[in-house]
């Protein structure tokens, strides 16, 4: 959806701005967040597997955090979920590490449809 594109672009710009201001790396500031993470990881010589695990864990943690705040899930249950997902995150990072660019992508059809609907609502807690 439009808001997911905006979110990824804004996160990328903020991340790159932080990199430019705090380290001697003049990374392009007009990058989507996942691309910015990859470029910075390469520049700072972060091993690909560790970079993928950190990125995926951050993504999953953000989703769990929404659940903690709005289900309500509770922090202890959220931590248990994250711990239980660590092997899945590591497995997915290993798959991504050996994948060719044409094999990478994502599909979250129902989530994307919900996002498109959600961005047209008047009263929302979060951007989509």
Describe each region flagged by the PLM.
Residues 58-128:
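C-terminal auxiliary extensions adjacent to catalytic cores
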Residues 1-73, 80-83:
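Amphipathic alpha-helical interface segments
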């Amino acid at each position: 959806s439009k808001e997911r594109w905006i979110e990824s672009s804004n996160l990328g710009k903020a991340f790159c701005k932080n990199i430019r201001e705090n380290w001697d790396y003049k990374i392009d500031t007009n990058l989507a967040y996942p691309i910015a993470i990859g470029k910075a990881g390469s520049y700072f010589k972060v091993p690909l597997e560790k970079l993928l695990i950190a990125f995926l864990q951050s993504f999953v943690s953000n989703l769990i955090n929404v659940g903690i705040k709005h289900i309500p899930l509770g922090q202890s249950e959220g931590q248990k979920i994250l711990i239980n997902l660590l092997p899945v995150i590591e497995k997915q990072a290993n798959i991504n590490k050996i994948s060719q660019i044409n094999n990478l992508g994502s599909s979250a059809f129902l989530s994307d449809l919900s996002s498109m609907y959600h961005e047209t609502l008047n009263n929302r807690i979060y951007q989509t």
